[in-house]
Amino acid sequence: MLSVSCVNIFSKIINPDSIKEPTDTPKEIPISTDTPTINLVQNFKLPIQYLDNSQLFSITDNVSNDLELITTENEKQKSMYHHLFKPTNNFAENLIPEWKKYYTTNIDYLNDTKNVLENMTEYRNNLLQDNFNYNIKCEKINEIWNELKMNDDFLSKYNYIEWDMIKHFNKSSDILQVISIMNLASPMISFVMPFMLLIIPFVILKFQKIPITFTVYLDVLKEIGKNHFIGKALATGMGSLTADKVIYLIFIIGFYLLQIYQNVTMCSRMYNNTIKINDYLFEMREYIEYSIKNMECFLKLNKELKCYNGFCNDISKHCDELRKMQLLLNRVKPFELSFEKLLDMGYLLKCYYEIHSNVDWEQSLKFSFGFEGYMNNLLGVFENLECKNISYANFDLSGNCHIEKQYYPPLVDENPVKNDCKFDKNIIISSPNAGGKTTIIKSSMLNIIFSQQLGCGFYKSCVLNPYTHIHSYLNIPDTSGRDSLFQAESRRCKEIIDIINES
């Protein structure tokens, strides 16, 4: 078992005065404030998590916090993973906490990961061929997901059938089309019905060949309309108008106008919902097309990598589900006010409901969000490789760790003094306060972790015999708790020793 601790890890004295403290300020990724942001990539499994548990080792919270892997004490500075991955969208940003969970001693996996990174040039070219250039809109997708999956009033809001016994009719475009037409036509019917009642007496009298006079017409009209507001209004208005009759007349007219208002409001809501559904489905269609292309490019280049078999199998499975969604959404076009779009309302509602209710599609979409974040992270690593900010490591089970010209990640855009480290014996580092002792230790620990996750780090070269345990003794807070600082330091040392002994 190999174990490395932040307290004693160096083989020779390094000049700590040559290390500069980071002063960079991160470029913030814009996040929409209109819609609550959900972490859609939280349960995504990185390729490293497909390895056998015996080859996986967790990064403790102490180590993560001390090395500032995810968060920093200064909110204006980037975390260490941000310097490595350079996330450009929210999916990539939200996936970063998943990286800090594990590192591995599986050298075959690390070499396969290096091959994946080396294939990124071809991956990027394949993705951009045929002018395929989709700009992913994470905020829009988050908004769509909230509406599809987090809306408790989904069925009632979009006028779907809510009765469980016949809820399956929501998957019938024909039935949904009929319901939509009826809902859209109801305001017109309510408005036209009074005028039709005015015409019907003429038709009846003409059919019965009865001479048409105004008195006869009114009698027939009152008989026909006795259950409608017109008949009631005529019956009320033809007599003497008392106060109670006037109030009653106003009431029934007001009720009729309210009915028209409600119908028009419902019709307007349906129209706006149709525009929204069409917009959401078209966005999902474009995203799914992009995601399928993304997965196919990765599989084409990396399906033969042995340590990536499990990951590639999952990609293939979810890609098949996305193709089914793509087939369903192929008919969806940008919204335009036309008769053709009116006849498509049932189909749009069917597609929308299918995505809302299909559990397999939900899992595949969530996988695609995580996969997008993963590929964006890899592109950030590859960009660092192209710029020669980082280099690949070599692995040797017979020797000690030897890192040449390593430096602290936050100094990547500066001109740092680089240092060599050879871990064949313990050493003691000494320097004045703020001389860079902690920076050297953190640089070494970070590069070991990065190398055992991705096979590369912030150095010119590295030969590494993978470590199984990584401990940190960098930051022991002096709090007002029951432990003194000395007791807290002793307790941390005891925890590290116990872990080593148990292993």
Question: What are these model-derived regions, one by one?
Answer:
Residues L2-P432, I440-I441, S451-H469:
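Alpha-helical coupling/stalk and coiled-coil linker elements that connect catalytic or binding modules
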Residues T439-I440, R482:
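Conserved ATPase-coupling elements of RecA-like P-loop NTPase cores
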Residues I441-F458, A488-E502:
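GG-anchored amphipathic helix commonly corresponding to the ABC/SMC/Rad50 NBD signature/C-loop
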Residues H469-S503:
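Switch/coupling sub-region of P-loop NTPases
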